[in-house]
Amino acid sequence: MRKGAKYTLEFALMADGVAPKDVYKVLASKDGQNRAFKKLDELKPSIQWWEAGAQPPQYLASGDVVMSSAYNGRIAAVQKESNLKIVWNGGIYDFDAWAIPKGLSKEKADAAKKFMQFTLQPEQQSVYSQNIAYGPANKAAMSLLPAAVKADMPTAA
């Protein structure tokens, strides 16, 4: 399990029987947070923590663990050479965002906007997604992706 708060409490609540649709409602309360930490305390002897994205595939391939949370792109990258498969049911989606810091010079802000405009084009997003199995930020890129690439993405449906 990823060593950090991000998604760890969500997985703990699901392990404790909370329906995925109710996780954030439960987690919003102090009792829900305590419930998640209590479940983690219970599971702690069986958890092997990871900090780097490359660790889950290594732990799985070596037999150190029988299942793990992992970045889908890391598992997709080694699927062909291993018996590892992604199980989407019970997974958590993640996303990132571009940001331009307030107070940048006009020149730097314009360069950042130009960079974002380029990288967010469907063609560029398609190249990105074909190199690591993460869904493109621009939905129009999905039609440019081969079916085999789409199969490794949670956003393909």
Question: Where on the chain are the PLM-derived regions?
Answer:
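Periplasmic-binding protein-like
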Residues: M1-E10, Q33-N34, K39-E42, S82-K102, F118-A141, V149-M153
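Extracytoplasmic ligand-binding site segments that recognize negatively charged/polar headgroups
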Residues: M1-P57, A61
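Solvent-exposed loop/turn segments at secondary-structure junctions
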Residues: G4-T8, N72-A76, G91-Y93, S105-K106
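A bilobed periplasmic-binding-protein/Venus flytrap-type ligand-binding module shared by bacterial periplasmic
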Residues: L13-G17, F95-E107, V127-Q130
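Short amphipathic alpha-helical coupling segments at ligand-binding clamshell hinges
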Residues: R35, K39, K106-T119, V127-Q130
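Short, hydrophobic alpha-helical packing/hinge segments within bilobed ligand-binding/sensory domains
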Residues: P56-Y59, A112, Q125
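A ligand-binding cleft/hinge motif common to bilobed small-molecule-binding domains
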Residues: M67-N83
